[in-house]
Amino acid sequence: MPELPEVETVRRGLQPALEGQTLKSVIVRRAKLRIPFPKDFVRRLTGSKVERLGRRAKYLFMHMQGGDVAIIHLGMTGHMTAISGKAPAPGKHDHVDFCTTAGATVRFNDVRRFGLMTLTTEEELETHRLIKNIGPDPLANSFSHEVLSAALKGRATSIKAALLDQKTVAGLGNIYVSESLFRSGISPKRQAKSVQ
């Protein structure tokens, strides 16, 4: 599953193709991925300008002019590719195309269909059910030793389990938690509250 660093790389890679661009069309080739697409997904995005791409944990955000926000999760095998010029015919696992008036296509491919796309608004983004319980983002300027220490205080669970809990630290998965603990010389079985 793509973890926070990979999702941030995807966000940065898609910026030139999407930011500041108007979506000429949005093509959805199946009714659902992990969850059904909102019934008005295509209508609300088509003709709207992508003001900026954001990210929180493993979620990508397409902030649209007018206040809509598309929430995208890549799931286990999902990826997004920017195609300039005429896009090739979609393959079996190419589920969504975002086509801009500038002629670019951003294609979402997901073999296992564990990804998701949904909509919310700027006003409701922080309280959206997928976002509201996510912990601090380790790439945010506000993240610090003190923030992590406070999140681990009193936690009797293992440090590995605590770091994998998205309410403790957002966006970390098994790869980065295991590597970080190994490089720090901290046993993954050590109680979280003992790490200061």
Regions found by a protein language model. Name each.
Residues 56, 171-172:
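Alpha-helical architecture
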Residues 2, 36-37, 48, 140-143, ...:
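Short coil/turn linker and secondary-structure boundary residues
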Residues 1-115:
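A cross-family signal for N-terminal binding/gating loops and helix N-caps
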